[in-house]
Curated annotation (Swiss-Prot):
Keywords: Cytoplasm, GTP-binding, Hydrolase, Magnesium, Metal-binding, Nucleotide-binding. Its cofactor is Mg(2+). This is GTPase Obg. The gene is obg. It is found in: Cytoplasm. Mg(2+) binds at residues 173, 193. It comes from Desulforapulum autotrophicum (strain ATCC 43914 / DSM 3382 / VKM B-1955 / HRM2).
Amino acid sequence: MRFIDEASITVISGKGGPGCVSFRRERFIERGGPNGGDGGKGGSVIFETDPAKRTLFDLRRQKIIRAKNGMPGLGSNKHGKNGVDLIIPVPPGTLVTDQETGAVLFDLTEPGTRITIAKGGRGGQGNKRFATSTHKAPRFAQPGMPGEEFHLKLELKLLADVGIVGLPNAGKSTLISKISSARPRIADYPFTTLTPSLGMVIPDFGEPFAVADIPGIIEGAHEGTGLGIQFLKHVERTGILIHLIDVSQIEPDNPLDAFNLINTELSLYSATLAKKPQLVVLNKIDLTGSMEKVEQFKKAYGTGELLTLSAATGEGTAKLIQILARQIAEHKPLERKSETDHGNK
């Protein structure tokens, strides 16, 4: 399944500055020759692939991106100041298409790549350029050339930075709806979620990041039980795992039963998957008797880091977002591969 982040924008490069009509004005020289300078070049709009960028969130809010115009030429043959190029960072894997035709214009895959999307207009020539042997005092100059304007659609195949795993009914859908933009179907029975959901989390500090709610993994998932293989493939492509546990289901005689079951399925499917960083989160602490269950789990779990929260009430979710934002910032950005074959959507 593809998770697509999209943005529709208009990019406009800067107009060239007009040339100047000017003549030398010096003492004792009644009729100086033309000395109008050329106008400055308009600024270009440039896309640069930046591995620190994970989403198109900022571009979705901008809509119109406009570079600076070039400045007019000046007397004394002074060239007008060029408009500053506008460099827009985009995530690697961004596909740029024409909104009207759907034609693929650029496929930005390599970090650090710079592509001029809209070239700035050329500055107009000053009147000095038009002086000839027969027309020594031209009183006109050239206007600056207009910039370019394009209506673009940007697409990014998202790889979730964070995957939420846990047994059915652990509260994954409720949690992702609380901390992100995702709105999955939620009900109080197992297997409500039958397909992965993706939500964007906007932390107070740091870059937005993507969280995937991976449908309930059950015993035998690595062998294909339920939709096991399909779900585990999604987990494999995330960077960090939230291991979500329903405290109401913790058994006093074996508090780590659910925790061990999920980790066993992950390790049997892929050794790489089993080594992914995990943040253990105990959910539903708003329920009666939950804190006793939390203590039972902590005692069996040992000194490892874990977090308690209630996805239903929101208690503890702000802290979870802070921890995830910090952990993601400490890891290298996920490698993204752009796919131009839209026929397999």
